[in-house]
Every structure is written in C-alpha cells, then in structure tokens.
Amino acid sequence: MKLLFLFPLLCYPLLAAKSVLIVSDGVPVQILAVQLKAHGINSETVTQQSMPAKLAGYPAVLVYIHGVLSEAAEKAFIDYAKSGGKLIVLHHSISSQKRQNPGWMQFLGVSLPEGDVTQGGYKYYDPVPLTLVNLAPKDWIATHDVHWESRAEYRGEDRDAIELPATEVYLNHVLNGQHIILLGLKFIDKKSGVTYVQDTAGWYKKAEKGWVMYFMAGHSGKEFDDPAYAQILTNAVNFRP
C-alpha cells in the first residue's frame, strides 16, 4: 500500500513541470522542439509579437530570432534573465542584424567588429562544414549524457567534437564579459585555405540573478538532430547552478 501512495508523489513533479518557451521567427526550431520532447521537455513556441507579457514563470526561455528583434522583446528577455530566469540564445539571435540592438549586444557581452574577416571583422559562411569542439570537459552542460562521436585537434590538443556537414558559421564574435566557454569552433575557409579556431560556439554567463547562454549552431535545424548537440541543449535547459 505504501508503494501505491508513493508512486503518484514521485511522478507529480514531472506532470506538473511547466513547458519551456521558445520565441522564434524560424522553422528550424520545430526540430529542436521535437528533440526536447524526446528528452522529456515540453515546449511552447511563439513569435516575439505573440509572446506572453511576463516570462517569469518559465523555467527556460529559448530565443531563435533571425530578423529584427523588437525593443519590447529585447527588454522582456533581458528582464527575465536578470530577474532569475534562464535565457538560451540560439544561432542568429547574435548576428549582424542585432547590431541594431546595442543594448542586447551589451547585455550578452558580445561585439561584432566591422571590417575584413582577416583583420578580425565579423563574417558568416553558409553552408559549410563545421566542427564544434568540447572546451569544457568538466562542465555538466557539456558532459552529462553527451556521447561525443568524433575527435578533433584544437589548439594542439585532441578533443571531443561534433562534425556538422552543412551549417552556418559566424566568425570573429568578440566576447567582452565573464563568459564560461563550453564549445569552440573549427572552420576551414576553402577559398583562402585559412583555418579558423575560435572559442565562441557555446558559452554561458551570469546575468544578475539569472543566466544567459548562447549556442551558435542551428541554421537549418538539422544541427538539432545531432545526438550530442541535442543533449547539450537539453542540459542547458535542465541546468541548475
């Protein structure tokens, strides 16, 4: 009889768990939502125009916005994180379009320099093969249930890696704050022959009472189907400091 009463109590937190919120203007997040569901995380997808006025009740808010980021949405995201929320910023939520949102970029602690890529200027390439490299082998987000299927040389070290055959890469993100680096990127520009190795493909940082995280890969949505990458994003959603 004790077991019969205990079972509902153990299951109750799972049944009562609130969905995470995905704010998006792109189809690729549908694949992410499926992957989160497969990992036991329910999600609700909205546009920035239809998002709830208050975000405080969500255990995590994921942002995937390619186009213009409205002032109202920007403020809501920043307030949510600073008030104790977990804001997960994906792919082109940091891109040249977001230069129009200096408050957003300052909050993230990222700048996108002008100028030629060879001189440190921001540039994107698409579609290209990209290697994501584990730079945090002791961090829970980068390791918990993550089965890395590849290895790559990175700054003279052999590291766990994810090989993405066709995605979009952003070069020369400049990080200006106390970012905890999770993922690096390795990309070979076939035209110039230059190999770029940068510690900018995944990170997180404190945002007053909460957290903000960023993961670069996700242009087509197929990236979210990679088992290791899907698990990393699941870990980000489930992260408890």
PLM regions with names:
Residues A17-V23, P28, V34, Q106-L108, ...:
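Extracellular ligand-binding/catalytic regions of CAZymes and related secreted enzymes
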